Amino acid sequence: TEHMFFEADRIKAMREMIVSETSEQREKALAKLEPIQQADFEAIYEAMKGRPVTIRLLDPPLHEFVPTDPKDIAELAKEMGLTVEHLNQVISSLHEFNPMMGHRGCRLDVTFPEIAKMQTAAIIKAALAVRSRRPAWKIVPEIMVPLVGEEKELAFVKSVIDKTARKIIKEAGSDMTYKVGTMIEIPRAALTADAIAKEAEFFSFGTNDLTQMTFGFSRDDAGKFLASYYDRKIYESDPFSKLDQAGVGRLVKMAAELGRETRPDIKLGICGEQGGDPSTVAFCHKIGLTYVSCSPFRVPIARLAAAQAAIKDEQ
């Protein structure tokens, strides 16, 4: 959902939320974003025509949204009633030495539950609105919590989601159901997937981050040395394009098995660039995953690979 916030009509409200110093200020800024998010989600539900829709909550660190241009900083300070000096201090406080492993994903919702509350409200209200217009469509929102590494972490965020969603659904007099799941992208989440499945109704294996955290190198920096690894036959392929079945794949298989032990009907899939790689799709089919998610231009390849894997399985 984070890509929705960068457009001009919404980045200001997002920045107001980030530099807010009280929950009241944050909620005021989030109230500006909620109808915008709802409209976006309604458009998604309309485009999908009743097909399953999974919406991931805010994932990246907040510093990615704050202004860096002095003119933008001065403008935001004026709108917020702050001095430029104070706003610069707030922006500096958001700096992280390792943002990939920092204050992002579900950690944002633990720190600022009002973010999860706003996004949940937008998701549920959008689904109810489209459902009222399209009664023949079976719309069951799937809300995905990113970067979970601990069962209690997901339980906390899920409690915020449930409280918000149930209230809206009850007030609407609706019988609509929804699902809450998580991304498995931290090795600890894969290792404790049986516990996490007590709270999660579905897993989506975020193979981009899971690969980074399992290998211990950043996708953004790995280009500096991976070529040498290919030349010396240490790695035969880019682990960010083709799933490393021996390491990352083993974690995925383990987590899938553990998740099914706790919740036999759990929905399992992967999302990431590897989802468009034929060998990765075949591996996912083999271990019982039910779907892959990938960038649009990789979809035809993924669909073909899924069909080939299914045919091979029948032979």
What is each of the regions a protein language model found here?
Residues 1-315:
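Conserved alpha/beta-domain cores
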